[in-house]
Amino acid sequence: MEESQGTIGQSAVVEASRAAYAIIREKFADAVSEFDANPTMPFFEILDTSRWSEIALFMRDNASLRFTYMACLSGMDYPEDAKLGIVCNLESLGEHGHRIAVKVKCDRDGGAIPSVANVWKTADWHEREAFDMYGMLFTGHPDLRRILCPEDWEGYPLRKDYEVQENYHGIKVPY
Amino acid sequence: MQELEQAVNRSVRVIPQGEGRVTIEKDLSSEEMILNMGPQHPSTHGVLRLECKTDGEVVTEAEPYLGYLHRCFEKHAEVVDYPGIVPFVDRMDYLAAMNSEFAYCIAVEKLLDVEIPRRVEFMRVIVSELNRIASHLVAIGTYAIDLGAFTPFLFCFRDREHIMSLLEWASGARMLYNYIWIGGASFDFPPGFKERTAEFVNYFRPKALELQRLLTENEIFVKRTKGIGMMPPDVAVNYGWSGPMLRGSGVEWDLRKHDPYSIYPELDFKVCVPDGKHSDIGDSLSRHLVRAYEMVESLSMIEQCLDKMPDANGFDPRSAIAKRIRPKAGEVYGRAENPRGELGFYIVSDGKSTKPVRCKARSSCFVNLSAMKELSMGQLIPDLVAIIGSIDIVLGEVDR
Amino acid sequence: MGLLDAKISNHNVLVTSVDNVLNWARLSSLWPMGFGLACCAIEMMATNASNYDLERFGIFPRSSPRQSDLMIVAGTVTMKMAERVIRLYEQMPEPRYVLSMGSCSNCGGPYWKHGYHVLKGVDRIIPVDVYVPGCPPRPEALIGGLMKVQELIRMEQIGISRAEALKKLEEKSFDPGIVLEHQRKSQAVS
């Protein structure tokens, strides 16, 4: 790919995301942060976590936004801020073609993020996986339990300070 | 008569026979049974457990339980450096290993300032499309054997062996290749590879037609898959479906066309969507048809690449690969069109280390399988097998 | 055929030992419960399919543990799956053999160091008779492993335990290189 063609293509994508962000910012003002227009993954952060499901519904149903497709919801660990978070990649599939990423953060111990499983059904299992790996709670999730690790697994594996348990049901876990 | 009807239970029917006589029909009493399919089961395509609540033969709900193959990919991705993650990515979706490596390398290369040599781009696309055909062959072969047809399975695996020998010739391994590296590829095509691939394309075209006559147009197969597991397109998008699943519901969305990467913009191919003549749009047969058509499209893509590919002339596919892969600080969500859907990687890099801070694999099968609960409502148990086969899951990718 | 001590008299009577007949019967129709978990399962399927046909050895994969006498553990065993593996092993009727296929079930494979959910080798929970290395092992390697199981069955006798049979197998095993070397030398001489 030509270098100039690549950057032109990239900045068109960023501008489309910025336009979508502007509509959200207009409605929700201080509940959302400033737009981070980096070329690889433009995103914004939800500052008022309690309004996340409301914002999600708006993003999905508003006629100029129509973010119908959630590509991915990843859990994240921010050990230096003592926070956990999620990063959602959303796209308007086949309609407007713009895409954006949203970040939501919460506290490490007992933190909770509102669930968007009723907005995008993709989020159902992705939130269960984030809970399994990181331990943050999702309020309003229909069925929040571990999905990949067994139900009685101890600890949250993808946290940076995770220590493997020695035994699981009598079987030795480390090598 | 009316009092008699009202006085009896709902499961009892009173049918008047005339002349004051009646026939009383009573259903057998039934109660809900919870049945476990798996994790060890011949037709669940791996270690998947389906907890089915059944009322007789009718399934009221089938909930998938995962995690039986959770191999901690994301933890490994945080302790192993960027090039070392490629073999782990291979082992996630082991049937489409080249495609998975391609997706990962595209994602990391977005954070690097590297110019991929043109020949490498063509090499990557050729092996990816070959692997796509191989993966669809397994999907179709195992789908057929689940439904009881043994011969297509043998035909598919026979043809797949040819692809595996080609890929073994190029990369050194039959199944888990570690071939597509960040910034290039590990080895160049050996001399004679292009000719043999062209031979394979000519060999396989009539075989794909043979498979269609054997399986796709077979009345038993059509009866078992038509109208089963219907998914309307807007619900499919909301579930996050992608790939042949989404195209089987009629949505024309192919990442190679609509969010293109590598040299796909230069290739001429069409997005395979079922036309509704042979199947109902959104059912299992449509999804199978999309895979069958895609195999033939991949053949034409391979031919175009072989024509346009620049010559070797002492080319080194590792020339653009840096000694230490240290992407700049930032995050990226890179994705590619796998045979099963969209495989995406959300990678966070801090710019200083050679290991990612976070590497999340957004797997296509995980998302496709999440709709299982809704698809299975009201189906018969054998239809459940037909639905799982049409979703084409690979548990390595579901559980990572 | 392996009927070592068979002598056929003119009344079509075969004289051999009971052990030989039983062992021959068992090794010629080993029915595995192909316990395909991950990538090795695909190579196992490829070995069963047309190119490397396993059916010519009498090996026909069965889905149920109750009807099989060999369990091929093909793929990574995770902690969640470990208890099910034990249960399936216990459901198999004796005499039963276990073949561990691939690095993951031998020792944990590529996930040995950081895989918190991976069982580091299926021999931590069930006794394994033959290990086939590889990631994944080639179909030829799997066939070699199955032939090793057949050799093990040849060593079995009524009244000796499995451990003794395994020891006999080790003693009887030889390096084929020595035989080939000998053949080459004798051909060079003549």
Swiss-Prot record, chain B:
Family label: Belongs to the complex I 49 kDa subunit family.
Entry protein name: NADH-quinone oxidoreductase subunit D
Membrane topology annotation: Peripheral membrane protein
Domain of life of the source: Bacteria
SUPFAM superfamilies, sorted: HydB/Nqo4-like (SSF56762)
Transmembrane segments: none
EC top class named in words: translocase
Designated gene of the protein: nuoD
Localization in the cell: Cell inner membrane
Function: NDH-1 shuttles electrons from NADH, via FMN and iron-sulfur (Fe-S) centers, to quinones in the respiratory chain. The immediate electron acceptor for the enzyme in this species is believed to be menaquinone. Couples the redox reaction to proton translocation (for every two electrons transferred, four hydrogen ions are translocated across the cytoplasmic membrane), and thus conserves the redox energy in a proton gradient.
EC number(s) stated in the UniProt entry for this protein: 7.1.1.-
Record GO terms (molecular function): NAD binding; NADH:ubiquinone reductase (non-electrogenic) activity; quinone binding
Cellular component, GO annotation: plasma membrane
Species for this entry: Prosthecochloris aestuarii (strain DSM 271 / SK 413)
Catalyses which reaction(s): a quinone + NADH + 5 H(+)(in) = a quinol + NAD(+) + 4 H(+)(out)
Subunit: NDH-1 is composed of 14 different subunits. Subunits NuoB, C, D, E, F, and G constitute the peripheral sector of the complex.
Assigned keywords, A-Z: Cell inner membrane, Cell membrane, Membrane, NAD, Quinone, Translocase, Transport
Keyword set includes Membrane: yes
From Swiss-Prot, chain C:
Gene3D superfamilies documented for this protein: 3.40.50.12280
Major subcellular location class: membrane
4Fe-4S as UniProt keyword: yes
EC class name: translocase
Alphabetized UniProt keyword annotations: 4Fe-4S, Cell inner membrane, Cell membrane, Iron, Iron-sulfur, Membrane, Metal-binding, NAD, Quinone, Translocase, Transport
Domain of life: Bacteria
PROSITE patterns: COMPLEX1_20K
SUPFAM superfamilies listed in its UniProt record: HydA/Nqo6-like (SSF56770)
Ranges that cross the membrane: none
Pfam families: Oxidored_q6
Location of this chain's protein in the cell: Cell inner membrane
EC number, UniProt record: 7.1.1.-
Catalytic reactions of this protein: a quinone + NADH + 5 H(+)(in) = a quinol + NAD(+) + 4 H(+)(out)
Binding site for [4Fe-4S] cluster: C39, C40, C104, C135
GO cellular component, one term: plasma membrane
Membrane topology category: Peripheral membrane protein
InterPro entries: NADH_UbQ_OxRdtase-like_20kDa, NADH_UQ_OxRdtase_20Kd_su
Listed cofactors: [4Fe-4S] cluster
Molecular function as annotated in GO: 4 iron, 4 sulfur cluster binding; iron ion binding; NADH dehydrogenase (ubiquinone) activity; NADH:ubiquinone reductase (non-electrogenic) activity; quinone binding
Entry's Gene Ontology BP terms: aerobic respiration; electron transport coupled proton transport
Subunit structure: NDH-1 is composed of 14 different subunits. Subunits NuoB, C, D, E, F, and G constitute the peripheral sector of the complex.
Protein function: NDH-1 shuttles electrons from NADH, via FMN and iron-sulfur (Fe-S) centers, to quinones in the respiratory chain. The immediate electron acceptor for the enzyme in this species is believed to be a menaquinone. Couples the redox reaction to proton translocation (for every two electrons transferred, four hydrogen ions are translocated across the cytoplasmic membrane), and thus conserves the redox energy in a proton gradient.
Protein family: Belongs to the complex I 20 kDa subunit family.
Protein name in the entry: NADH-quinone oxidoreductase subunit B
Source species: Prosthecochloris aestuarii (strain DSM 271 / SK 413)
Lineage, highest ranks first: Bacteria, Pseudomonadati, Chlorobiota, Chlorobiia, Chlorobiales
Gene responsible for this protein: nuoB
